[in-house]
Structures are given as structure tokens and as C-alpha cells.
Design a protein with these regions (language model features):
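Active-site loop ensemble at the mouth of alpha/beta enzyme cores that anchors a bound cofactor
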Residues: 236-315
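Conserved, mostly hydrophobic/aromatic
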Residues: 31, 54, 84, 154, ...
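Active-site loop/helix belt of alpha/beta enzymes
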Residues: 142-145, 151, 157-268
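C-terminal accessory subdomain/extension
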Residues: 287-391
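A charged N-terminal "starter" segment
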Residues: 1-108, 382-391
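Active-site-proximal beta-alpha core segment in soluble small-molecule metabolic enzymes
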Residues: 52-199
Length: 391
């Protein structure tokens, strides 16, 4: 296998001298490869792909996912849905729409979808994930205000213990209630298997399957159809065939990947399409240098496998560790025994963030590198369209 420095240099080119740092640079070739591979996997296993846009937050990237065959898009918040409606009219809000402000914006989104449907002659589809009767009641009222049905996906807790109905009986009861309400359209079940890692045992996958199957069997015995059974997470995405009850997956990170995904074994360094370029602004000691990328650029998320390994991978210097972050400073250290090359003040280095989703949300824009674009050194600056959409 190529070293980190060799792998990095395969198709990335030097940046112009005046390129601003710190900044996020995304390689279009790597993005295309990542998107194509996931879509091919889904096609081969007859799974609908509904990618989560929380990673890239980009209308341009979302449109490419749809063009390659994605069924629709997943978002977390209504604000993201407002932006991503420019890329697809089939949207799933995988987050309970609780709160007056959020429900008002959902109502506005539904009205806009209705107006667009009237002008285009085709209906848009909006669904929301819930795990409580209280959430369902509020969304039902919102739907009645608009006079349009809202799709509902009931969230099951399959073991990650974040959101989701834990009890199968309660899940069946909630689904049955939703299926009888005017203003609501029961679309199916959703879950997030965040506790299942790539090396999970057959038993873990069986438990994941059984947690869903019990609810599905009971609903069908009551005459309630379950059209969609949706799972998620990039680490489990290409193992989803091990849970044959699924017919849809919602991975997000796969478009860019990050250092967490590399450590989990679901991506290689060459699959990491988004990297931060930073400038060395100080070399206070032989084994330490300071970057202009701090927590406001890289985020303070630690590594999911090795929390003490630092705040991202310095690709140019694999032995170095981003040991500490201030808002505008990234402190990088070498081991005491390190005898290799070191950067100088003014040099630029590349960092693969631990958690790319948070890193993207910290940027106003990113630079897309397209090898076949001769203008501006192949770089195009694009807005992070859904940045900061927290409502």
C-alpha cells in the first residue's frame, strides 16, 4: 500500500500561492467515485438510497446524488429541507419537528411544495420521522392547516438508544394511530443502527433485524402496510444486505468520508474527498508547529476509535498529531524520537478531519477541485448552502 504522502499526491495538485487558508477543499473525482460506489451497491441489493445531506449541506452535491439514482434526500432540520428542496422534491426530515417555530417553517415548506406541485403538475413528497404521539399530533395539525398529507416514518430504537420507540408494542400502537389520522400518511419505519460497526457479529445483525421484523409482522397482521423500512449510517451502509428487511438506507458521510471512517475500516485515505488546507504560522520548538486552523475550522470532535490521537490527520506528516486546538490555532506535535522532515513557517499542510460533517458546517464555503476545469487552477468556490440550519 502507498504511504500517506504518496496516496495523497495521486490526483491532488498544488494550490495557487494565493489560495486562502484555512479552507476546505473537495476533490470532485473522489466525490464521484464515492457516490457511484454507494449507488451501485444499492442497485445491486435493490435498496433505495436516500442520502443524508447533513454531511455536505450543498445543493450542488445533492443534485449529483439525485442524478446518479438516489430516491430522494434526507435532512435533519426544516431549514435544511428548505435548501434541499432545490435539489429534490422527495424529502425526509429524520428528526421530530417539535416546537412552534419549527412547525411554522414546516407548514411553509408544505405550502411551497403544494404551490410547486400545482405549477409542475406532479406532487412533491415530504415525510417526517417521529417517536411520540405528541409529535404526531402536532404534525397532523400542521398538515390539516395546509390541507396536504404529511408522510410519517416511525422511529424505532434498534439498539443505539438515542431516539426511537423502544417497545415493540408501543411502536405498533403509534403506527396504528398514525395510519388512522387525517392529514397523516403512514410511510413506514426508520431506525439508526449507530451501535453496529463494520466488524459486528452475525448475532448483532440478527438482533437489528429482529427489532424491526417484530413490529412489521404485527402491523401487517393488523392490515397496515409498511412501504418503507429505512436504516442508516455510513459504517453499516454496504453491509445493509445483512438485514434483508431493509429496503432503504440513509448514509451521509460516504460522500466525503473522514478520519473516523478510515479508522473504522469503511474507507481508505484515498476515499477522503474533503480536506482542510492550513498554513504553518509558527514553529515555536523543534517538535511543534502551529497552524491557522483551530476549532473554528476543524471542530473539536475527537476521534471515535482513538480519542487521544488528536483532532484530525495531518496527511503530509503522518507521524504528527494535532494535539490541541484553540479557536484560531491548531497545535501539532511530533514524537520526541521523530527524525523526519519538518515544515517551515509559511508551508501549507493538509488535514483530514475526524468528523467531516461538523467541519463542513463550520465553513461558509468550500473549494471544489475539478481536474478538467482550467480556470482558477481547477478550483471553484461554492457556498455551504445549508450551513447553520439548526431549526
Amino acid at each position: 500500500m502507498a504511504s500517506s504522502r504518496e496516496a495523497f499526491s495521486m490526483h491532488w495538485i498544488p494550490l495557487p500561492e494565493d489560495h486562502p487558508t484555512p479552507s476546505l477543499v473537495v476533490d470532485a473525482l473522489t466525490v464521484e467515485r464515492n457516490l457511484t460506489r454507494m449507488q451501485q451497491y444499492c442497485n445491486e441489493h435493490r435498496l433505495n438510497l436516500r442520502p443524508h445531506t447533513k454531511t455536505h449541506k450543498s445543493i450542488r452535491m445533492a443534485k449529483r446524488q439525485i442524478a446518479l439514482g438516489a430516491k430522494g434526500l434526507t435532512v435533519a432540520k426544516v431549514g435544511e429541507a428548505e435548501r434541499m428542496s432545490q435539489a429534490s422534491r422527495d424529502l425526509f426530515l429524520a428528526y421530530p419537528a417539535i416546537g412552534t417555530g419549527r412547525l411554522q417553517r414546516l407548514e411553509g415548506l408544505l405550502r411551497a411544495s403544494a404551490e410547486e406541485s400545482q405549477s409542475l403538475g406532479t406532487a412533491g413528497r415530504i415525510a417526517v420521522g417521529i417517536d411520540s404521539l405528541e409529535a404526531a399530533e402536532r404534525i397532523a395539525q400542521t398538515a390539516r392547516n395546509v390541507g396536504l398529507p404529511v408522510g410519517i416514518m416511525v422511529d424505532l430504537d434498534v439498539g443505539f438508544h438515542r431516539t426511537g420507540v423502544e417497545s415493540s408494542a408501543q411502536a405498533v400502537e403509534l403506527c396504528a394511530w398514525v395510519s388512522k389520522q387525517s392529514g397523516l400518511e403512514f410511510r413506514g419505519l426508520m431506525c439508526f443502527p449507530g451501535h453496529i460497526l463494520p466488524a459486528a457479529s452475525t448475532e448483532a445483525w440478527s438482533q437489528y433485524h429482529d427489532a424491526i421484523a417484530g413490529v412489521v409482522d404485527r402491523l401487517r397482521s393488523l392490515g397496515i402496510d409498511v412501504p418503507v423500512i429505512s436504516g442508516g449510517s455510513t459504517p453499516t451502509a454496504k453491509e445493509s444486505h445483512r438485514n434483508p428487511i431493509l429496503n432503504e438506507i440513509r448514509p451521509g458521510t460516504y460522500i466525503y468520508h473522514d478520519w473516523n471512517e478510515v479508522a473504522l475500516g469503511v474507507a481508505g485515505i484515498d476515499d477522503c474527498a474533503a480536506r482542510v488546507v492550513a498554513t504553518v504560522v509558527s514553529v515555536p520548538t523543534k517538535n511543534k508547529f502551529i497552524l491557522d486552523a483551530g476549532s473554528k475550522t476543524l471542530s473539536s470532535d475527537r476521534h471515535c476509535v482513538e480519542p487521544e490521537s488528536g483532532f484530525g490527520k495531518v496527511v503530509d506528516y503522518p507521524d504528527a498529531k494535532v494535539s490541541r486546538l484553540s479557536e484560531e490555532h491548531g497545535e501539532v506535535i511530533f514524537p520526541e524520537t521523530y527524525a523526519g522532515p519538518r515544515p517551515k513557517v509559511g508551508d501549507r499542510v493538509w488535514i483530514i478531519p475526524n468528523h467531516i460533517c461538523v467541519c463542513v458546517n463550520l465553513q461558509n464555503s468550500f473549494f471544489l477541485y475539478q481536474q478538467d476545469n482550467p480556470e482558477h487552477g481547477g478550483l471553484e468556490e461554492l457556498a455551504v448552502d445549508a450551513r447553520g440550519m439548526l431549526v
